[in-house]
Amino acid sequence: MAYIEGNTGKWEYVIGLEIHAQISSKSKLFSGSSTIFAANPNSQVSYVDAAMPGMLPVLNKHCVHQAIKTGLGLKAKINKYSVFDRKNYFYADLPQGYQISQFYYPIVQNGTMEIPTSTGDLKTIRINRLHLEQDAGKSMHDQSPHYSFIDLNRAGIGLMEIVTEPDISSPEEAAEFVKKLRNLLRYIGSCDGDMEKGSMRCDANISVRRSGEPLGTRCEIKNINSIRNIIKAIEFEAKRQVDLLESGEKIIQETRLFNADSGETRTMRLKEEALDYRYFPDPDLLPLVISDELINELKANLPELPDQKIEKYTKEFSLSKYDAEVIVADESVAEYFEKAANECNPKMLTNWLTSELFGQLNKASIGINECKITPSNFAKLVKLIENDTISGKIAKTVFEIMFETGKAPDKIVEEKGLVQVSDNNVLNTVIDEVIAENPESVEGYRSGKDKLFGFFVGQVMKKTGGKANPTLVNQLLKEKLSS
């Protein structure tokens, strides 16, 4: 367990997260308006989104399905009866004067997610609920020195708010949870998880306490927009609370904002309670009733999820858990790997994938979907190494050409004359030449200077243009030099 080191001893982190995940949907939660990112301001606003009098919301069925699938991925209970409520507050970018949410009867409850801890063990984080709600618009204060502007393109976009219990005990665990949740949402297809674009936002509820003591007063940090900032915000806020408590002051329950530039949190407003929002059922929307048939249908059509893939890779492909997790961390990489793994040695493929290919992709700043090397050609390269057609050293040269051109490895090997020399007679002839040309080195090796062996290997490689089979060269050289 991680601790905050105070002047008077150690303090524990107590952290709960609220994740706002924008639902992957072409239209909004209660209107047919488009959800395309970065459209011209107020170009995707219906009368419903603008809260014009008499306009009634109509629930988007696709958004409901996305929430159910996410709940199933979280091993949660899907409530067959849920209700939409009005959360009442006034803000300029909320034209209705209330937000449609689910307070009393959410669509999903009681889920779990396992995350790795610093000790290598798995820790279960309980999911209190997942509920549907609509997003607000966007206030813009930097367009004019005299006016503020409102963009309602985002108003009414469907969100899933995923709320954990306060089971998280360190900033790193919080980051692991968000990373794993984001990956799950991407596999399911219910959210793209792009935190930079704001389609996934994190609020952190943070308190501190001495070991064994009751929970302390919590503060909520709003709209943290990156994994790195989650760690920074929690570390700063927890230390701030410890400093206050150790100096005899009390923690005020409040909502705070994190400034990524300064690495500090600041007061935004005093924390509201549920009573402040005067929740009541929305009279314009009927309760949502979900059938067993729909739940079973959506469950049957779920894709293979990250934890299932990790288990499959460790069992079927004999990968280490670490390697499996690295591959599964990106759905596109996992898809690429599976296409190639059926045609070659999966372990060797993994080594080349995570070292050579990842390195080149990072250098080129592109994703695996933009890579010119097809999974089939990558598998062919691995097979050429497996069957000793080329050496690992030559394979790197071939790989670089493949990455630049997309050519098949066998054609590159043929065109460049890179086939590995594995003929014993040819290699013995070359070795005899090397031994004849270096009598003093031979005498030195036979008198106990074992390090000279590398010299002989290098000379053979030089004469064959680096194409000699290194395993055979070692074997034949030892036989020749010891005779």
Swiss-Prot record:
Molecular function terms from GO: asparaginyl-tRNA synthase (glutamine-hydrolyzing) activity; ATP binding; glutaminyl-tRNA synthase (glutamine-hydrolyzing) activity
SMART domains, A to Z: GatB_Yqey
Superkingdom as given in the UniProt entry: Bacteria
Catalytic activity: L-glutamyl-tRNA(Gln) + L-glutamine + ATP + H2O = L-glutaminyl-tRNA(Gln) + L-glutamate + ADP + phosphate + H(+); L-aspartyl-tRNA(Asn) + L-glutamine + ATP + H2O = L-asparaginyl-tRNA(Asn) + L-glutamate + ADP + phosphate + 2 H(+)
GO biological process, alphabetically ordered: glutaminyl-tRNAGln biosynthesis via transamidation; translation
Keyword Nucleotide-binding: yes
EC number assigned by the record: 6.3.5.-
Broad enzyme group: ligase
Keyword annotations of the record: ATP-binding, Ligase, Nucleotide-binding, Protein biosynthesis
Sequence similarity: Belongs to the GatB/GatE family. GatB subfamily.
Described function: Allows the formation of correctly charged Asn-tRNA(Asn) or Gln-tRNA(Gln) through the transamidation of misacylated Asp-tRNA(Asn) or Glu-tRNA(Gln) in organisms which lack either or both of asparaginyl-tRNA or glutaminyl-tRNA synthetases. The reaction takes place in the presence of glutamine and ATP through an activated phospho-Asp-tRNA(Asn) or phospho-Glu-tRNA(Gln).
Quaternary structure, from the entry: Heterotrimer of A, B and C subunits.
Name by which UniProt lists this protein: Aspartyl/glutamyl-tRNA(Asn/Gln) amidotransferase subunit B
Organism: Rickettsia conorii (strain ATCC VR-613 / Malish 7)
Lineage summary: Bacteria, Pseudomonadati, Pseudomonadota, Alphaproteobacteria, Rickettsiales
